[in-house]
Amino acid sequence: MKGTTHVHYELLRALRNWRTLFLSFALPLVVYCLIVPENRHAVTDGIPFPLYFMTAMAAYGAMWGAINPGARIARDRSKGWVRALRITPLRARTEIVAKVLTAYLVALLTLALLYLAGALLGVRLDAAQWFEMTGLLLVGLAPFVAAGIALGHVVSVDALPAAMGGFVVLLALLGGAFGQLFSRGAMLTIVKLLPSYWLVHAGSSVVGSGSWPAEGWIVVAVWALCLTPLAVLAYRHDTGEV
């Protein structure tokens, strides 16, 4: 099976899954369209509320899309498919790359849907700002992709929904996806150590300085550099490649 064929197969699996359709696409889109019309003229985090909440809901849906490959990995493990792959011509690297690319493709679809809704509800950015915000969001998803792969190879298929749900919802909530919980003090300092904070605030970063400050890049990089080796170790342990 060629790499592109396997990516296509994984993408179809993702898009046929009702959890992906609901959590990555429907939920953030519906919440955005319900909340924003009544708050079109509000200001949050120094930017128009429609822009802030568009970025927040796009980040929330994209987090689900990024971590979702873990669910497919867990299902494959429960059926013995992960170990069976070792005796097929499909290389392990191809399998992992397909999962990662699928995560990002689903995330891009989420961003496109929320961008369209935002534009229809008054969000106005120039082309460079749209691209810059998209770039920040995709970079910020790296820890979630790694977390999904790690959880998929470690947690049982029955326990995985709770594990993934707790991880995404907690980080999204603390990061400000459903409204800023902390605007000052020690708690704000703590939540700035989460990658979800910088995902949610990608819009205000683009409108302000055009990018995250150094602190944001460091936080996302540290999370990615910590979770990626864990994902690799989980995969090797699960498949017997130790």
Can you name each region flagged by the protein language model?
Residues M1-L21:
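N-terminal Sec/SRP start-transfer signal
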Residues L15-H41, F49-N68, L109-T110, A163-L173, ...:
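Hydrophobic alpha-helical transmembrane segments of multi-pass membrane transport/permease proteins
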Residues T20, L51, A62-I67, V97-K99, ...:
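Short alpha-helical transmembrane interface motifs in multi-pass membrane proteins
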Residues V30-V31, F49-L121, G166, A172:
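Hydrophobic alpha-helical transmembrane segments of multi-pass membrane transport proteins
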Residues L34-H41, G152-L193, Y197:
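Transmembrane helix segments
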Residues L34-V36, H201-V242:
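Alpha-helical transmembrane segments of multi-pass membrane transporters/translocases
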Residues A92-G166, L170, P213-A221, T228-P229:
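Alpha-helical transmembrane segments and their short interhelical loops
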